[in-house]
């Protein structure tokens, strides 16, 4: 299929998503400490955006300046538009923090003490803290021919100090650099008796700016300003040269902190000549400098909601439910034997997934366990269960994706621990990240008086990560359906062995059948619409970028297919364009939880085909990753997925944003009845 249809810019779409996240911080219906958290989440998202997307744009401009972006802009023009919008977003973020959120926190007894507000007792406490806890760890670097400008680590907190006078060796002091080690706390609690507030805090940068002169004795400090450099964090691994992926990665990881600079953040009051020097040392242009009114890293404030015991200023706690079929069963295998089980996280607990693996590790009837791991965290009971299974003599095989961005080191550590207890560890297929979420358990059972091997499978849309399972919306399926189990077995064969493509009967798998099946399903809806039948596509995902899928959706709209897309993040498709996409709607749900499940619905002339998947409709997921989409066949479970995963989002009029044909979003206006997808599901499932 030739792609001749218009697309929207990816980078601008990512910034648009972060604008929607930041809008949560402005919503008075969101608890105050959660509003602060949304500001911090925006900062964290922007860090990754610059480390990956902006770094990639800069590289493309250097390597191929005449090239065009997929949406048809010159690279430089696209870069300039993205920088302009990013600057506006950062300005809005800091304005919201200082003019709205921090004053509201102060009214609630949560206060950040600036140095110019300290009384004598507070000043003495701060001085002692600096001298006792901070000074021994800090290393000042004076800049002169013998001390060149240091290589600043990625996203580290640094201070540039303008000096006057001569040092002990008679050298004229001009400038110094102080790097704040990551071991130092970024936020320090002031004793309540001194603070006068129930929760008083002092930022590390406040200590530094007030007492930095202690690091440069007998010199005059003319100015002290914080700065932060963001670097290209993509890892380069030559797939043709490596013989051991883990060893190659271990050699590359330290270099991540020293990649090419892509962004400079400085406090707004930094003198112009200092900014010029920092830009020169970083090989950056003026447009790459972000002057901020306050701390250069708002992510450091993410810990405040956890440090402040004010439940009234946070989202209400909830207890995820356990389905009765699991709660009433003697063991997980008995529950699955009774029929397929659908889990909807975070509303339903992730604990049954852990219990399935933990019971398998101890069950003498279990002979083998196979598992994929993409992200699981540094302290994972799931990994503990896999290691326990290996120690108990089970045949344990784990496909660990070492190239899961920013989790490489964690996954390398888990791979080493698994190998140490005798598990088989493989790293998937070089060149194709393993993003599929699969667990396969093989158990010896007696059926009709005869011993046989029975397979059990868990498939999911999200990671095997107990912490994010309480923060992200995802579906998981537990089944003993032997066709699905056989397909999962074949996928593991491909990941761990070498051989030709195996035929799958139930699963769609990238990079082989997933993309063709999606296109075929859309084309079937087009054919039905042209035949005068009802036709509909509803899809939910994190991102929609793949051009041929977008082209198929445009053609579907022109044929009269009703297309509803629920895309949380970036979407390159233009909805609502007359003659092109007037039958397509795109909405984004942004709320308490991160919308994460991927759902594909096709009306299929009334048969209603529903697939769950780990894959977004992006080039990388469809062609450069190992992904699976799995069908929901059981009628009751299918109705649940449609109702809980799709219909509630389409009906949401509180947390939904509707995409306009120019790529901008507007909030959906609430009707007479307020409907919030996430709150409704919390009320349905949780106590």
UniProtKB/Swiss-Prot annotation:
It comes from the Bacteria. GO terms for biological process: polyphosphate biosynthetic process. Mg(2+) binds at residues 375, 405. Its cofactor is Mg(2+). It catalyses: [phosphate](n) + ATP = [phosphate](n+1) + ADP. An intermediate of this reaction is the autophosphorylated ppk in which a phosphate is covalently linked to a histidine residue through a N-P bond. ATP binds at residues 45, 472, 568, 596. Disulfide bonds: none annotated. One of its GO terms (molecular function) is ATP binding. GO terms for cellular component: polyphosphate kinase complex. It is an enzyme of class 2 (transferase). Its EC number is 2.7.4.1. Keywords: ATP-binding, Kinase, Magnesium, Metal-binding, Nucleotide-binding, Phosphoprotein, Transferase. The active site is at residue 435. InterPro entries: PP_kinase, PP_kinase_C_1, PP_kinase_middle, PP_kinase_middle_dom_sf, PPK_C_dom2, PPK_N_dom, PPK_N_dom_sf. Catalyzes the reversible transfer of the terminal phosphate of ATP to form a long-chain polyphosphate (polyP). Belongs to the polyphosphate kinase 1 (PPK1) family. HAMAP family: Polyphosphate_kinase. PANTHER family: POLYPHOSPHATE KINASE (PTHR30218:SF0). This is Polyphosphate kinase. It comes from Burkholderia ambifaria (strain MC40-6). The lineage of its organism: Bacteria, Pseudomonadati, Pseudomonadota, Betaproteobacteria, Burkholderiales.
């Amino acid at each position: 299929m030739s792609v001749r249809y218009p697309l929207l810019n990816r980078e601008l779409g990512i910034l648009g998503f972060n604008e929607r996240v930041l809008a949560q911080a402005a919503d008075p219906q969101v608890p105050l400490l959660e509003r602060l958290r949304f500001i911090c989440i925006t900062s964290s998202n922007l860090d990754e955006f610059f480390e990956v997307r902006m770094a990639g744009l800069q590289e493309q401009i250097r390597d191929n300046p005449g090239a065009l972006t997929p949406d048809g802009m010159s690279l430089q023009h696209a870069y300039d538009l993205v920088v302009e919008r990013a600057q506006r977003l950062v300005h809005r973020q800091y304005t919201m923090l200082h003019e709205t959120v921090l004053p509201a926190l102060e009214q609630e007894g949560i206060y950040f003490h600036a140095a110019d507000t300290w009384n004598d007792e507070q000043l003495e406490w701060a001085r002692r803290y600096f001298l006792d806890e901070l000074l021994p760890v800090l290393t000042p670097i004076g800049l002169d021919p013998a001390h060149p400008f240091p290589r600043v680590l990625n996203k580290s907190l640094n201070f540039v100090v303008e000096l006057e006078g001569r040092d002990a060796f008679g050298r004229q002091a001009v400038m110094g650099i102080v790097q704040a080690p990551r071991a130092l706390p970024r936020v320090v609690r002031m004793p309540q008796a001194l603070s006068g507030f129930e929760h008083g805090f002092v930022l590390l940068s406040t200590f530094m700016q007030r007492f930095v002169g202690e690091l440069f004795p007998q010199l005059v400090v003319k100015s002290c300003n914080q700065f932060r450099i963001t670097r290209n964090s993509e890892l380069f691994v030559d797939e043709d040269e490596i013989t051991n992926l883990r060893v190659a990665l271990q050699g590359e990881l330290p270099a991540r902190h020293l990649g090419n600079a892509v962004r400079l953040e400085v406090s707004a009051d930094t003198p112009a000549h200092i900014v010029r020097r920092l830009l020169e040392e970083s090989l950056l242009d003026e447009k790459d400098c972000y002057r901020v009114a306050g701390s250069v890293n708002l992510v450091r404030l993410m810990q405040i909601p956890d440090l402040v015991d004010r439940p009234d200023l946070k989202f209400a706690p909830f207890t995820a439910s356990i389905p009765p079929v699991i709660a009433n069963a003697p063991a997980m295998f008995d529950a699955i034997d009774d029929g397929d089980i659908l889990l909807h996280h975070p509303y339903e607990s992730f604990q049954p997934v852990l219990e399935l693996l933990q019971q398998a590790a101890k069950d003498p009837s279990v002979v083998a366990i196979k598992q994929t791991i993409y992200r699981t965290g540094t302290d994972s009971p799931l990994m503990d269960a896999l290691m326990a299974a290996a120690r108990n003599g089970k045949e344990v095989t784990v496909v660990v994706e070492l190239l899961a961005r920013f989790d490489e080191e964690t996954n390398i550590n888990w791979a080493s621990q698994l190998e140490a207890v005798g598990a088989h560890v493989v790293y998937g297929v070089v060149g194709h990240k393993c993003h599929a979420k699969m667990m396969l358990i093989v158990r010896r059972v007696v059926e009709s008086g005869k011993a046989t091997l029975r397979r059990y499978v868990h498939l999911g849309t999200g990671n095997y990560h107990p912490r994010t399972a309480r923060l992200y919306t995802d579906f998981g399926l537990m089944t003993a359906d032997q066709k699905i189990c056989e397909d999962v077995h074949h996928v593991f064969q491909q990941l761990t062995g070498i051989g030709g493509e195996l035929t799958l009967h139930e699963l769609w798998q990238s990079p082989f059948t997933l993309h063709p099946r999606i296109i075929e399903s859309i084309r079937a809806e087009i054919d039905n619409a042209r035949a005068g039948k009802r036709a509909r596509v509803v899809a939910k995902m994190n991102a929609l970028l793949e051009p041929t899928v977008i082209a198929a959706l445009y053609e579907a709209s022109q044929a009269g297919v009703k297309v509803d897309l629920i895309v949380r993040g970036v979407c390159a498709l233009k909805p609502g364009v007359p003659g092109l996409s007037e039958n397509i709607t795109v909405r984004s749900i942004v709320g308490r939880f991160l919308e994460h499940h991927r759902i594909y619905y096709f009306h299929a002339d009334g048969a209603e085909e529903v697939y769950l998947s780990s894959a977004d409709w992006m080039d990388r997921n469809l062609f450069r990753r190992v992904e699976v989409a799995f069908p929901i066949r059981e009628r009751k479970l299918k109705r649940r997925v449609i109702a809980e995963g799709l219909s509630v989002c389409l009906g949401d009029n509180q947390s939904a944003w509707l995409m306009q044909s120019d790529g901008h979003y507007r909030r959906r206006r609430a009707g007479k009845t307020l409907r919030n997808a996430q709150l409704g599901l919390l009320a349905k499932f949780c106590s």
